[in-house]
């Protein structure tokens, strides 16, 4: 979260153009959290130059490109940070415009623009089936669409939405429909990587297009919740007694579009939450005088962690016997990345006992 808090001063005190540019950068940077990525200090300094009007967005993107070309030559490149920086700059350019190609072709082109210079197959439909282990599903996966039907499914969903009328619907009904559309679009998962970030940017552009004001921090601060809510909206397991659960995504959009205050912490979305995380509260409602089961605040040591470290801590808090390999599998990370993150968390997480049969202790 500290990645984009540095832009607060521009949003509070800056000129209108500075406020707008800072808000867009916050959203672009915040969206990297869906894959546990964090931007570099160089990206933040470059963003500030753009916010202050010293350079335009294309110059900012070129500076970042040149910066990583230099690092690659020296063999000191951080691939995750490189992706986060370049994608953040690309998203900032896209969100700085109001144009939207609301079509399957436009959705695919948007993926290409977001991941230009990052992914080898940017803007290409995947030609293989995929599964993804999700920590919110206890390492189970959503059933994504098979690869043969991807483009037709995109065309169908977007055409259906194009022909849908919001006339005579209440705002609450509109929110429910928007959540259904976005959930279905994401479930197609047409690309090998970058589906959630593409869906988020497409959603922001579309909501603007149909008249909603989405110039706030919700996507910036809660992009990981957004992804997990999409997962829960598309997951069903009859054996475990779990049905599709769109209400979490609807609550995200209720906060975004209706100004409600649902507590958007990810632990409420887990399919097997502890007792204190079973009921997601609306913080905007008046609290009764009766004792409350839900926690009011997470410990500071938890909220001060990076998104990736929060994911690791959340998994270990549910199962302290997880091996590093199982953590890596559940989060879709490499073993080296997991080891590096655990090392950075050594002041609060330690492994006790033999290599096999030991457990993690959280201070």
Residue ranges and their predicted role:
Residues 1-363:
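FIC/Doc superfamily catalytic core
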């Amino acid at each position: 979260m500290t990645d984009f808090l540095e832009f607060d001063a521009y949003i509070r005190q800056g000129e209108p153009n500075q406020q707008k540019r800072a808000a867009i950068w916050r959203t672009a940077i915040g969206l990297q959290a869906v894959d546990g990525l964090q931007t570099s200090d160089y990206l933040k300094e470059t963003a500030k130059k753009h916010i202050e009007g010293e350079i335009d967005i294309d110059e900012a993107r070129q500076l970042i490109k040149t910066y990583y070309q230099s690092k690659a030559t020296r063999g000191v490149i951080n691939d995750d940070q490189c992706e986060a920086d370049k994608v953040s700059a690309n998203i900032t350019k896209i969100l700085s415009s109001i144009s939207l190609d609301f079509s399957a072709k436009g959705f695919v082109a948007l993926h290409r623009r977001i991941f230009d210079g990052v992914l080898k197959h940017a803007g290409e439909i995947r030609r293989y089936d995929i599964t993804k282990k999700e920590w919110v599903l206890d390492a189970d996966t959503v059933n994504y669409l098979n690869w043969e039907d991807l483009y037709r499914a995109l065309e169908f969903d977007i055409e259906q939405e194009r022909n849908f009328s919001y006339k005579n619907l209440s705002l609450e009904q509109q929110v429910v429909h928007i959540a259904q559309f976005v959930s279905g679009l994401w479930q197609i998962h047409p690309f090998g990587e970058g589906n959630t970030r593409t869906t988020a940017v497409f959603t922001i552009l579309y909501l603007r297009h149909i008249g909603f004001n989405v110039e706030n921090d919700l996507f910036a601060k809660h992009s990981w919740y957004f992804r997990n809510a999409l997962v829960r909206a598309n997951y069903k397991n009859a054996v475990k007694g779990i049905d599709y659960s769109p209400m979490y995504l609807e609550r995200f959009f209720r906060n975004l579009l209706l100004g409600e205050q649902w507590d958007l912490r990810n632990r409420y979305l887990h399919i097997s939450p502890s007792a204190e995380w079973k009921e997601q509260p609306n913080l905007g409602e008046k609290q009764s005088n009766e004792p409350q089961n839900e926690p009011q605040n997470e410990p500071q040591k938890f909220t001060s962690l990076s998104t990736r470290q929060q994911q690791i801590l959340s998994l270990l808090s549910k199962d302290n016997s997880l091996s590093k390999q199982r953590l890596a599998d559940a989060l879709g990370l490499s073993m080296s990345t997991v080891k590096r993150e655990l090392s950075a968390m050594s002041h609060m997480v330690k492994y006790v006992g033999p290599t096999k049969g030991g457990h993690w202790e959280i201070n």
